[in-house]
Design a protein with these regions (language model features):
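N-terminal helix-turn-helix DNA-binding core of bacterial DNA-binding proteins
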Residues: 1-33
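Core alpha-helical elements of the protein kinase catalytic domain
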Residues: 13, 43-44
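Residue cluster at the C-terminal edge of the helix-turn-helix DNA-binding motif
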Residues: 47-50, 78
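Beta-hairpin "wing" of winged helix-turn-helix
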Residues: 49-64
Length: 138
């Protein structure tokens, strides 16, 4: 998993809490990253219809989705998050050994199941839930 999901949730909570448009610079300052990284992640959220951009003096990003119904699963999907992933596979499918030739397929199925479990869990948590948790523990 990369940091896109974390950044997206952070930005959406900021936008929800502020109730107004925020620039990529303002979001980056709160998230503690650079504006270019923010813009890259926000592009996925915009494409998914969660935010819109506005030009001008009070321009920036504005939350268009209802934070009370916007789930973390939807956010994860918008930024193409895979929670469990493995770029390297052990073994060799062309070998005669069952372990050597089958391990990658078995582990890939395990990773898919784990991602499905994560997505199911996140479908019950909204942006408002995260915002509420933050201010309950203040």
């Amino acid at each position: 998993m990369d940091s896109s999901f974390n950044l997206a949730v952070h930005a959406l909570v900021c936008l929800s809490h502020s109730g107004r448009s925020l620039s990529s610079e303002a979001l980056a300052e709160n998230i503690c990253t650079n504006p270019t990284r923010v813009r890259r992640v926000m592009a996925g959220l915009k494409k998914a219809g969660m935010v819109e951009t506005r030009e001008g003096l009070d321009g920036g990003y504005r939350l268009t989705a209802d934070p009370a119904s916007l789930t973390l699963r939807q956010v994860a999907e918008a930024v193409n998050t895979r929670f469990v992933d493995c770029a390297w596979h052990s073994g060799d499918i062309d070998r005669d050994c069952v372990i050597c030739s089958g391990m990658a397929g078995v582990l890939d199925a395990l990773y898919r199941s784990m991602n499905e479990e994560c997505a199911a869990y996140l479908s019950h948590i909204t942006i408002t839930d995260i915002e509420t948790q933050l201010f309950e523990h203040k």
